């Protein structure tokens, strides 16, 4: 069970609330934010990274590559961003 304790140390259990709020205030100072919007932003980011990983893995499998390369991730990012626009 040593593996599980080392993995738990690397994974953050909470969203970086202060960092997200500070970054949003720097970029958009007049934007009014609700109380827990930082959690929604963090969740959205995690979902994007998960979709990116899945899509890049399928791109790597289609090109018969055992390793996910930079090109696979860039192609996956284009597809995911195009889907998210609507």
UniProtKB/Swiss-Prot annotation:
Annotated TM spans: none
Coiled-coil ranges from the UniProt annotation: none
One GO term (biological process): mitotic cell cycle
Tree of life domain: Eukaryota
Molecular function per GO: DNA binding; protein heterodimerization activity
Recorded GO CC terms: chromosome, centromeric region; inner kinetochore; kinetochore; nuclear matrix; nucleolus; nucleoplasm
Cell location: Nucleus; Chromosome, Centromere; Chromosome, Centromere, Kinetochore; Nucleus matrix
Keywords: Cell cycle, Cell division, Centromere, Chromosome, DNA-binding, Kinetochore, Mitosis, Nucleus, Tumor suppressor
Pfam family, one: CENP-W
Similarity remark: Belongs to the CENP-W/WIP1 family.
UniProt subunit comment: Heterodimer with CENPT; this dimer coassembles with CENPS-CENPX heterodimers at centromeres to form the tetrameric CENP-T-W-S-X complex, which is a subcomplex of the large constitutive centromere-associated network (CCAN, also known as the interphase centromere complex or ICEN). Interacts with NPM1.
Functional summary from the UniProt entry: Component of the CENPA-NAC (nucleosome-associated) complex, a complex that plays a central role in assembly of kinetochore proteins, mitotic progression and chromosome segregation. The CENPA-NAC complex recruits the CENPA-CAD (nucleosome distal) complex and may be involved in incorporation of newly synthesized CENPA into centromeres. Part of a nucleosome-associated complex that binds specifically to histone H3-containing nucleosomes at the centromere, as opposed to nucleosomes containing CENPA.
Official protein name in the record: Centromere protein W
């Amino acid at each position: 069970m040593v593996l599980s304790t080392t993995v738990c140390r690397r994974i953050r259990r909470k969203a970086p609330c202060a960092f997200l709020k500070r970054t949003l205030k720097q970029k958009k100072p007049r934007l009014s934010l609700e109380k827990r919007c930082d959690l929604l932003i963090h969740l959205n980011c995690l979902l994007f990274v998960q979709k990116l990983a899945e899509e890049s893995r399928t791109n790597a499998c289609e090109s018969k590559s055992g390793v996910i390369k930079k090109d696979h991730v860039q192609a996956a990012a284009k597809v995911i961003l195009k889907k998210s626009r609507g």
